[in-house]
């Protein structure tokens, strides 16, 4: 993985007022034709997955298109403003992930998160790189049953006043890391109010359970 090579992939991209509505035109269509990849996106960022790589590239959106209440079928652009407290980057939800990862590192629970770092800037826009993981949904589908360990985990979370957002995955976390790290992770999630942890935002690197999208969203 070469930093300059990866950054150069985006040299022709336009990041001005980048949103979930326009990123395909401004970014995806500008990528080199011989670059093989897949991509997924949400409201705050796009995740580009180079074929065969053990990492993903994340690009934050700057804002979103808002439906105008006064003009039917008309939209206007609005910057994100609540991603973090960093002056000049309060719109950047990928930076939020990097900040959380660094906080987790100080508490020795960073292995519970996909390693995240800033790759660099292209046309004044930040580009991030993150360990590649498989999502819980990709690995397990939509489970329609509860295992015994899942039921035990629900009880454990209730007894310790933890929010039990996916008991099957949490049971894997407990088994892999042990009670001490599990409790520290759950306290971290509660402290920073990381709520949006559905089955596409949690997953695994090999057998290691990880959070792979942990910026949450607040507008």
Task: Give residue spans per PLM region.
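ATP-binding glycine-rich loop module of kinase domains
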Residues: 36-38, 43-106
């Amino acid at each position: 993985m070469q930093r300059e090579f990866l950054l150069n992939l985006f040299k022709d991209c336009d990041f001005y007022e980048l949103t979930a509505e326009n990123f395909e035109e401004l970014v995806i269509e500008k990528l080199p034709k011989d670059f093989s990849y897949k991509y997924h996106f949400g409201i705050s960022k796009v995740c580009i997955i180079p074929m065969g790589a053990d990492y993903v590239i994340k690009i934050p959106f700057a804002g979103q298109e808002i439906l105008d209440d006064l003009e039917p079928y008309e939209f206007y652009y609005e910057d994100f403003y609540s991603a973090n407290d960093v002056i000049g980057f309060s719109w950047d939800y990928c930076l939020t992930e990097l900040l959380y990862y660094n906080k987790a590192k100080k508490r020795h629970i960073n292995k519970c998160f996909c390693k995240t770092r800033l790759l660099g800037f292209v046309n004044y826009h930040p580009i991030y790189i993150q360990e590649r993981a498989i999502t819980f949904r990709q690995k397990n589908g939509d489970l329609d049953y509860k295992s015994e360990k899942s039921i035990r985990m629900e009880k454990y979370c209730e007894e310790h006043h933890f929010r039990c957002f996916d008991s099957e995955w949490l049971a894997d976390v407990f088994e892999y890391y042990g009670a001490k790290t599990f409790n520290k992770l759950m306290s971290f999630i509660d402290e920073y109010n990381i709520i949006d942890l559905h089955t596409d935002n949690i997953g695994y690197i090999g057998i290691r359970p990880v959070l792979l999208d942990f910026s949450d969203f607040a507008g």
